Amino acid sequence: MVQHRFLLVTFPAQGHINPSLQFAKRLINTTGAHVTYVTSLSAHRRIGNGSIPDGLTYAPFSDGYDDGFKPGDNVDDYMSELRRRGVQAITDLVVASANEGHPYTCLVYSLLLPWSAGMAHELHLPSVLLWIQPATVFDIYYYYFNGYKDLIRDNTSSGTNNVLPCSIELPGLPLSFTSRDLPSFMVDTNPYNFALPLFQEQMELLERETNPTILVNTFDALEPEALKAIDKYNLIGVGPLIPSAFLDGKDPSDKSFGGDLFQKSKDSSYLEWLNSKPEGSVIYVSFGSISVLGKAQMEEIAKGLLDCGLPFLWVIRDKVGKKGDDNEAKKEEEMLRCREELEELGMIVPWCSQVEVLSSPSLGCFVTHCGWNSSLESLVSGVPVVAFPQWTDQGTNAKLIEDYWKTGVRVTPNEEGIVTGEELKRCLDLVLGSGEIGEDVRRNAKKWKDLAREAVSEGDSSDKNLRAFLDQIKVLKDARH
């Protein structure tokens, strides 16, 4: 049997690298496929060297920002250069591989890279989108560009703190959405105007295909309605894309994503500290790899943690200044007024292995920005959540967490957009307390943990979906010969 050869192209950001690398491992382990992993040179340099599976090779290219995208860089210039250089690099790879007698079977690409699909079409190479956000978010974008734009814009252009009394319903989705539940790129005040045209380009490309398959980092039981909401698209759940050691245990050595674009804390004593705490007692606080909170918000979080009185592990990344600043790296925790009190009660680290932290029995709650990777990791680990969304898909994820999966409670900011210490403590007390809400979220967290692990078991939904996709690719490949 001829081996599948995949070209997997990923946007160079932490939230894209991690699930796509895990998908590469899944492809290799499921069928013995060969995967060539393509991303920028700056991202590749930060990918760990440990446990690279047989069948995975890297093909990094220069996007013109080999030291990474820095604050102060122009995002439109960056995206333009990434596209121009990426098209050339991937074209060269595809042509060279074909000339050597080892043509690629399929190109798989992540969000924000719709030009990859256009280029693959020109090269007569099948392509498929790896959607690394929930299926619900895909559906919302689809509806935005297919008849619901005015309705959505009308509901996101006014209101106090983006919370409106009115809500909208979208076909096939089980929840109604207010402004704060929708992806932030749709909001009039969204400053990241580069993103929405890329999603529009993506949807237009899919429209040209007949019943295209879209691989989604979710699983059937998690989003049954959203996966089936759009008849003309074949959305299939292939997730959760989480390291095997923390999911199905098939590969105990697979303990990290491998794509950690930030330096992990050199001092792993936080794991020993975690393990010394009583079961279910520790609050873990992390806002991911991109979000930067203002000093006022940081102070309120500190106040809420201190008032709660439970041990906590708080990830505060080193803040990188603009190029040319004398103080390029600043430790934000040093600016907190109550730093000494915080360190008496908890532990502050610049980065950590999140999947390891969440798997610790001492974890009682995860205060999270609700990035999709973090949301899935909390589900897989069975850890209840205080949802503290910031931007992009996170408001939608928080809505699903609180109202659909019911594994957490969402904070409500005040009129200035700040989540007060009192509000954070209120949510922590609900999630960690012995009342009905606390009992419900803990019970639901356990339920989804079991269902997530079941989904990737051999013969279950995500495993079957991936194998069906590979059979589909084989048919396409045979038709080309």
UniProtKB/Swiss-Prot annotation:
It catalyses: phloretin + UDP-alpha-D-glucose = trilobatin + UDP + H(+); (2S)-naringenin + UDP-alpha-D-glucose = (2S)-naringenin 7-O-beta-D-glucoside + UDP + H(+). An anthocyanidin binds at residue 16. PROSITE patterns: UDPGT. The active site is at residue 16. Keywords: Glycosyltransferase, Transferase. Highly expressed in young leaves, at intermediate level in mature leaves and at low levels in flowers and fruits. Optimum pH is 9.0. UDP-alpha-D-glucose binds at residues 354, 369, 372-374, 377, 393-394. Transmembrane segments: none annotated. Optimum temperature is 40 degrees Celsius. It is an enzyme of class 2 (transferase). Pfam families: UDPGT. Belongs to the UDP-glycosyltransferase family. Glycosyltransferase that possesses phloretin 4'-O-glycosyltransferase activity. Converts phloretin to trilobatin (phloretin 4'-O-glucoside), a potential antioxidant. Can convert with low efficiency phlorizin and trilobatin to their corresponding di-O-glucosides. Can convert with low efficiency naringenin to naringenin-7-O-glucoside. Can convert with low efficiency quercetin to quercetin-7-O-glucoside. This is Phloretin 4'-O-glucosyltransferase. It comes from Malus domestica (Apple). The lineage of its organism: Eukaryota, Viridiplantae, Streptophyta, Embryophyta, Tracheophyta.
